[in-house]
Curated annotation (Swiss-Prot):
Protein name listed in UniProt: Capsid protein VP1
Gene Ontology cellular component list: host cell cytoplasm; T=3 icosahedral viral capsid
Organism expressing this protein natively: San Miguel sea lion virus serotype 4
Keywords assigned by UniProt, alphabetized: Capsid protein, Host cytoplasm, T=3 icosahedral capsid protein, Virion
Domain of life: Viruses
Annotated site residue numbers, Cleavage: 152-153
Amino acid sequence: MATTHTLLSFDDLEFLLHRKDLTDLYGERCGTLNLVINPYELFLPDELDDDCCDDPFNCCFPDVYASIGTEYSYIDPPELIHEEHCATNGTWPNGDPCEPILPPFTITGTHHYYATKPGEVVSGILSKLGSSWDPSLRSTADVSNSFTFRAESDGPGSAEIVTEEQGTVVQQQPAPAPTALATLATASTGKSVEQEWMTFFSYHTSINWSTVESQGKILYSQALNPSINPYLDHIAKLYSTWSGGIDVRFTVSGSGVFGGKLAALLVPPGVEPIESVSMLQYPHVLFDARQTEPVIFTIPDIRKTLFHSMDETDTTKLVINPYENGVENKTTCSITVETRPSADFTFALLKPPGSLIKHGSIPSDLIPRNSAHWMGNRWWSTISGFSVQPRVFQSNRHFDFDSTTTGWSTPYYVPIEIKIQGKVGSNNKWFHVIDTDKALVPGIPDGWPDTTIPDETKATNGNFSYGESYRAGSTTIKPNENSTHFKGTYICGTLSTVEIPENDEQQIKTEAEKKSQTMYVVTADFKDTIVKPQHKISPQKLVVYFDGPEKDLTMSATLSPLGYTLVDEQPVGSVSSRVVRIATLPEAFTQGGNYPIFYVNKIKVGYFDRATTNCYNSQILMTSQRLAEGNYNLPPDSLAVYRITDSSSQWFDIGINHDGFSYVGLSDLPNDLSFPLTSTFMGVQLARVKLASKVKAHTITAK
């Protein structure tokens, strides 16, 4: 009998040894895949042309075979294949890795193993097996038809609700003639809004209605504009003009308001709404606070041209004001405002989204989302609270919606760069600033502090002592016992340099070799030996105290404000007579039931270890930066509203007016707000409407 011997090559022998090592790790299951299944049919989709594919596991469509698994060569260590294969199968609840259901397999004639993902190959094999039993058996779901999803409950109601609840459409009389609202199709060169944006209402804002509101007071006033709908506002960045009306839906969620009625009025373009019952002379409808379903009004587009530009505000207005308050006790409800485009709404004149047009944008990014990024515009520490005041004021680093400021600093904290001149025989402790390298206003350094000293003092060597009754071991700061000669000044770290002449007869080099030292800076009137308070800044009123030179030289200094010399228990910037300004001091007062606020942060004080005092800021620094550099559109009688929420779900609205000051609808704020806070832009509302809030009852009056 003849015996046939098969000679194995070195690669074949090495491959067999490699498979034996895998068998030790996986068990006897590891081996060659002997199922007679065409890999084309197993993995390649039917819609792909596979007639010319001779290597499906090195396919031109790598995304098709990504689900098969990782390909390993037999030269890869078996331990590596096993470890990485286990890593793709997840873990048990106790953290142990799951053993793969299907071990690596090789296709006959190749020297590669395929470590499959869980279930991929098994699923394909079972699908083919099922098809051999019943050719009509489908292994995939047919999702070509639309599905209708329905939420079921035990409560009564119809099971056939498949669309959003729309509300009650209010018939407005007299209705404008349809021909007056028609848009010429030839005037639109852009594509109309897709149907999906036309079918549902999107949240716009919410307003409060209290039964103590006077009859005729304006609760809501909105001019027709794409910005009142979030989707229209987004799409508007692609177009230059628009036309058409907008539907507005109101939902009243009451808290015991019975018998009250609201009036919805349509005010034509060119007419400014006033707070009076005479507004009912305009076309209007009334709706009751007891209305359980939403009510829908349409703001028609009444225009004398074919289209509106994006910055046009002289359009039809929808105004809501109280017509009747039916109860004597004070009670409040919330009115949710939602919008959607009307059927005739369209955009026109396509433009690139990055191109700028002259009108401003929506003020939706003035306050950072997280309070960890809130820094004051008077001092550079993080905001830690709020102070509600009947009057708020600040000039330096305060900007309005016209991108203007009455101050002298940019909305960034940069080192203060100044020049000081020393002379023989003069006071070598107190100096005037003679020049500056960086200035928004000529002669006044960028970043120079904006408060002055509280009282007249002597220009002495700077006694930094406290009264004799001060006890060094005491843990209580007694600022009234501060007897230093330079209280109210700002403590700065300094880098100083001097120019050394070739013929150094006055030994200026000795002065240059002195170490940089602390400087105390302030705005004051310094003459002879007297330093007086000065609330109007000028290049001649910039005073510096430090152990200065006794030579005739000019010194350049770069200062960084680090702290403050304590004056009394009042926060820095809380007394208007001590706040420095160039000419006028911008101010904000209570209006429409809303109160102006300061943003409060901490500033370190000298002498006391780790001690701080409060500092008042008129704006968050990011707000100052946005207003200085951006172009925002906000009417003078409106507020850009942000909802501030703490970690305990308390919230209140902050409104920023056209002058850049911030308001809240409360006369005081709780002292237990849980930081960090979050900010959400809520839209634009009238400044005369009280801002909403939901905070705990136990509050303290801010000081």
